[in-house]
């Protein structure tokens, strides 16, 4: 009996505990990133932003949570009730499930699997189903049009993101996210005789891929200037028009968790994960999770600034950028990287 407990029950309990801790921390981080997003946007427009609930408005996200939870959920009379309520749940759960393999520090992951990047790509590809289900089940033309736009947009930019990831995998030689971070201890900087630093991270040697990934991540998560899924002037709120209360909150939560995931992926793939910017003794004392969170917040700051400054693209411009610009660039970089590694015997 003790053998069964040690072999099966105890590992399951540990994974469940890790999952609960990750979920709580993730929700708190998302709440304050949403607060930061609103504050940055307000600062650009010379406004104060959230400033009433708590000091400097720090508890605004939690007040919004209570507001959504206690509102009455309204379901359109012609909607497919089961699918209508299931869609936001699917979006939120799938968005949070992808975080199971993200290492925020060395050894700090719920599941440190050898195909972590493949797992993320597979799960995130399913998130579009929640949007499509919500748009179709609403039995309204505007949500349905928003869902169709979302499906086309996400599929288009997943191709570019996939090629970017292939380029990183060719360079590193592993699908394990921890291995990808540790491989960035050495790079262009150390080849030039410099100490380990941010010059060794993949953002420098794969800079075109870093730019393609960042812009594709904006489109994949429906962030401005690619928020055509919920363009206010055309589709009001897109697939979320008919949603209110907790179902709307779940859609909104799934969207921001996906944005945070893209920031975390940029950190892991290109910005050295939990590694300090320079390998010196006083920076090495700082816990790796602090460096990881600082890099994640920097990536989110870039997302927020793009939202504040860049005007929305037209739908044809969005599709042209994905298929006629990013796809050829990312495909060329895959071939160029593979050729370089083969010629110089690094493969």
From Swiss-Prot:
Pfam families hit by this protein: NADHdh
Location within or outside the cell: Cell inner membrane
One example of a Gene Ontology biological process annotation: aerobic respiration
InterPro entries assigned: NADH_UbQ_OxRdtase_su1/FPO (IPR001694), NADH_UbQ_OxRdtase_su1_CS (IPR018086)
Catalytic activity: a quinone + NADH + 5 H(+)(in) = a quinol + NAD(+) + 4 H(+)(out)
Topology relative to the membrane: Multi-pass membrane protein
Record-linked HAMAP family: NDH1_NuoH
Full protein name: NADH-quinone oxidoreductase subunit H
Origin organism lineage: Bacteria, Pseudomonadati, Pseudomonadota, Alphaproteobacteria, Hyphomicrobiales
Record gene name: nuoH
